[in-house]
A protein has these predicted regions:
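Conserved alpha-helical scaffold segments that buttress catalytic/binding sites
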Residues: 2-6, 14-308
Length: 308
C-alpha cells in the first residue's frame, strides 16, 4: 500500500473479535503527523526527510499491519494519516506543530508524531499539556537532551527536555538508555529531578512503572547502531530492538501521545532504521489502544477482556 493522503483513515471495518472505536469508545483513533524539520540539528541534516520514509516502510509489503500483541491497524483500530506539516524552517513552525496536535486531541485522536529532529517534542508537549496537564514522560535515547542551549541555541535538538521541564509540561521524566551524561547534563538531571536509567545499568526491570497521562518519546539513536544505523549520532553500546519492545510491552498506563524522531535516511542501510521506526509506530499505536484512554478505566477493562 502506498502512503496515505492527508487525513486518510487506514481501515474502518470492524474486527470480529474486538470492539471498535465506534461501539466501545475504547479502541481509539491514532493520528500520524509528520514533522519534517531538522533546522535545530547540531551535527548533520537529514531527519527532515524521515516522515515519508517511515510511512513507506509502514505500508510496505515487506511486513503486515500487526503489532506483537496481535492488534492490527485497519482492523482493530483506526490509523489516520494527517500527512506532513508544511514546515518552512521559520519561526511559525512550532505553532504549526502545536496546532496540529491541538487538532488531533480535540478530535479525540491520539497523536503519534514522526520526526524530524528531537526539537519537535517541545511544541508537541505544549499542546499535549493544554489538553492533559502535566504528563509523565518515558524518553528513550542515547542522550539526555538537557543542555540549556547547545551552541547558543535554546531550541537545539539537544535541549528539548530542558525546555519541557522548565515550562512545567511534565511532572516526571524518566530517561532510558542514556550513555552520554556529561557534567552540564548531570547538573540538569539534578535540577529537574530526572530519573535516569543509564545504559550500563539497564534491564527492563530497572524501568519504573508509569502513571497516566503518559507521553513516550523515542530517539532512534537510543538503539545500538547495529540496530539503527540510520541516525546522525552513532553512540555504541545501546539498546537492542527487543529490549525496547520489552519496555513498551510492560507499560500499562494510558498513553496520550508519542513521537519517533531522529531517523536520518541519508545514513540508513537498506532501510533498516526506517523499518525499525515503522515497527515502533505499530507497537506504540497498539499500546495506546490496549492501554485505553485516561478517563475510562472500567470501560477499558471490559473491552480489553475481548481483545487478543
Amino acid at each position: 500500500m502506498g502512503a496515505c493522503a492527508p487525513l486518510d483513515t487506514v481501515g474502518n471495518e470492524p474486527d470480529n473479535g474486538c470492539s471498535t472505536a465506534e461501539d466501545s469508545g475504547v479502541v481509539r483513533t491514532i493520528r500520524l503527523i509528520g514533522a519534517p524539520t531538522d533546522i535545530n540539528s547540531s551535527f548533520l541534516r537529514g531527519p527532515a526527510k524521515a516522515p515519508p520514509v517511515i510511512r513507506a516502510a509502514l505500508y510496505s509489503d515487506m511486513g503486515n499491519r500487526a503489532a506483537e500483541c496481535g492488534l492490527e491497524f485497519g482492523r482493530d483500530y483506526l490509523l489516520e494519516d494527517a500527512g506532513d506539516l508544511p514546515l518552512s524552517e521559520a519561526a511559525g513552525d512550532d505553532e504549526r506543530i502545536t496546532a496540529a496536535i491541538h487538532a488531533a486531541c480535540s478530535a479525540g485522536a491520539v497523536p503519534l508524531v514522526l520526526g524530524g529532529d528531537h526539537a519537535i517534542s517541545y511544541p508537541v508537549l505544549q499542546a499535549i499539556h493544554a489538553h492533559h496537564g502535566a504528563v509523565e514522560i518515558l524518553h528513550i535515547d542515547a542522550h539526555p537532551d538537557l543542555y540549556h542551549a547547545l551552541d547558543g541555541n535554546p531550541r537545539s535538538h539537544a535541549s528539548p527536555f530542558a525546555r519541557i521541564m522548565e515550562a512545567g509540561l511534565a511532572r516526571r521524566l524518566v530517561q532510558v538508555g542514556i550513555r552520554t551524561l556529561n557534567a552540564e547534563q548531570r547538573a540538569q538531571v539534578a535540577r529537574f529531578g530526572v530519573e535516569v536509567v543509564p545504559m550500563r545499568d539497564f534491564t527492563p526491570d530497572a524501568v519504573p512503572p508509569f502513571a497516566a497521562p503518559l507521553y513516550i518519546s523515542i530517539d532512534l539513536d537510543g538503539f545500538d547502531p547495529a540496530c539503527a544505523p540510520g541516525v546522525s549520532h552513532h553512540e555504541p553500546g545501546g539498546l537492542t530492538t527487543r529490549q525496547v519492545l520489552d519496555v513498551l510491552a510492560r507499560i500499562a498506563a494510558p498513553i496520550v501521545g508519542a513521537d519517533v524522531v531522529e531517523l536520518n535516511p541519508l545514513r540508513d542501510l537498506n532501510g533498516m532504521t526506517a523499518m525499525l521506526a515503522a515497527k515502533l509506530v505499530k507497537e506504540l499505536a497498539a499500546r495506546m489502544v490496549r492501554n485505553g484512554p485516561v478517563a475510562a478505566p472500567d470501560t477499558r477493562k471490559r473491552a480489553m477482556a475481548n481483545c487478543p
